[in-house]
A protein has these predicted regions:
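Active-site/ligand-binding neighborhood in enzyme catalytic cores
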Residues: 94, 110-227
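Conserved flavin/dinucleotide-binding core of flavoenzymes
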Residues: 43-45, 99-100, 302-407
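Short loop/edge segments at beta-strand edges and connector loops
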Residues: 82-84, 214-216, 222, 232, ...
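Conserved Rossmann-like nucleotide-cofactor binding loop
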Residues: 12, 36, 249
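Dinucleotide-binding Rossmann-like beta1-alpha1 core, especially the glycine-rich loop
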Residues: 48-125
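Mid-domain catalytic core of redox enzymes
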Residues: 23, 219-337, 342-348
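N-terminal Rossmann-like FAD-binding beta1-loop-alpha1 element of flavoenzymes
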Residues: 2-30
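Glycine-rich FAD pyrophosphate-binding loop
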Residues: 21-46
């Protein structure tokens, strides 16, 4: 029997624990520094009991595995939602769907200019340029939309000018999309769901039968002759395998310096059910679930109406309106310019037999639930090889488990 310690009881840790217990003979201990499992995926509540989420808000197949839907349905019911997103390009402009469409753009004061630029691009029939992100956007959606929809947001959230970012950043997010009308959804073309009762029941059911030790802080890991030890504020735990979803730089004592992140803090308001759609509606009458505000003059990047997400079109009663404000102290989104530092950490982790960094924090990768499950599946498939490999082979396996930005 393999003794496994999982550091972190968020979705990556819980998913890995459940998957490995289902496939191999093992004893698993899960360590979580918070008082409850769930990590960024927990459903939180205001003082008056109204629910909201800090992290992911819906479930879909974005760019990971389609197995995510049946996997989650083992534990919770999934209620389909129409998730539309909008943008207000300037304070005085109306809200329009995002990704933008020509029908909505025409109603803007600058609509004719945007349409002329898009027409010229399409008539030229040349592929977008890829020198940098500005070049890519201006050659695919035109200078005006580039400035209004992307320039301010990138400076505000990522802290970088468009010309300092790679074209791949836009290609990954499909920022070039401008339809004639009606593409109101998220980058996922698959249906979107919200779990019945929120996300917390998912963890309550996934973690049944596990030794979950909440309120336990991990201070380090170290290689020993017979395996690996996890050092905590409650003592030392010996293991054959440690799956660490904690920040990889902190776990390895910032040997190469701290990794840079982007994130946000939140502000909450409550809207009553008689106030109408909190963020406006799309042309087909569906209320927007969230709204981007890309101009530099506001610190707010995005606002979410949880009445739409939690209750659907038949909403009733008050709901939370949540604003996301840039805060670099919150480690949510990895940045591309830290790849070199991250791979130093990954190589360092590979030199510790039995240590597997995993998830958003462990593998320094932006993930969704479907891509997290895909990551766990790749780990499970390669675990036997990993345990029998040398440091160089383990590094290659970890790179494969992480995947690229598209998986």
């Amino acid at each position: 029997m393999i003794e496994i310690v999982v550091i972190g009881a968020g979705f990556a840790g819980a998913c890995a624990a459940w998957t490995l217990r289902d496939q191999i003979d093992c004893q698993i201990t899960i360590l979580e520094q918070s008082a409850e499992p769930g990590g960024m995926l927990r459903t939180l509540r205001t003082g008056d009991g109204l629910p909201y989420e800090y992290g992911p808000r819906v479930v879909s197949v974005f760019r990971g595995t389609h197995d995510i839907i049946p996997f989650l349905q083992r534990f919770v019911g999934l209620e389909e939602r129409q998730v539309y997103q909008g943008t207000r390009l300037l304070p005085e402009y109306p809200v329009i769907p995002f990704p933008v469409d020509l029908e909505s753009v025409r109603a803007l004061p600058c609509g004719r200019r945007i349409e002329r630029e898009l027409t010229a691009i399409r008539e030229a029939q040349t592929p977008p340029r890829e020198t940098n992100l500005r070049d890519y956007l201006e050659s695919s959606v035109g200078p005006t939309l580039t400035e209004l929809a992307f320039e301010g947001f990138n400076r505000k959230f990522w802290g970088r000018r468009l010309e300092d970012m790679p074209a791949e950043w836009g290609k990954l997010r499909r920022l070039e999309r401008v339809s004639e009308s009606g593409l109101f959804r998220l980058p996922s073309r698959a249906p979107h769901y919200y779990p019945s009762g929120g996300f917390n029941p998912l963890f309550e059911r996934m973690l049944v039968g596990f030794d979950v030790r909440t309120g336990t802080r991990v201070t380090g890991v170290r290689k020993e002759r017979r395996g690996i030890e996890v050092v905590t504020d409650a003592g030392v735990i010996a293991a054959d395998l440690v799956i660490a979803t904690a920040p990889v730089d902190a776990l390895l004592e910032y040997e190469f310096g701290p990794l840079e992140w982007r994130g946000y803090r939140i502000e909450l308001d409550v809207v009553e059910d008689d106030a109408g759609p909190g963020l406006g509606t799309a042309p087909d009458g569906v209320p927007f679930a969230w709204l981007y505000t890309p101009w530099l003059g506001t610190p707010v990047c995005r606002t979410t109406d949880f009445g739409v997400i939690h209750q659907g079109p038949g909403r009733s009663g008050p709901a939370v309106l949540l604003r996301e404000i840039v805060d670099e102290g919150v480690p949510m989104y990895p940045v591309w310019w830290e790849d070199r530092r991250f791979y130093k950490y990954l190589a360092r982790a590979a030199r510790i037999p039995g240590l597997v960094p995993l998830g958003r924090l462990g593998l320094y990768k932006y993930v969704t639930m479907d891509s997290t499950l895909a990551m766990v599946q790749r780990l499970a498939e390669s675990l036997e090889s990993y345990l029998g490999s040398d440091a160089g082979q383990r590094l290659e396996i970890l790179r494969s488990v992480r995947g690229d930005w598209q998986t």
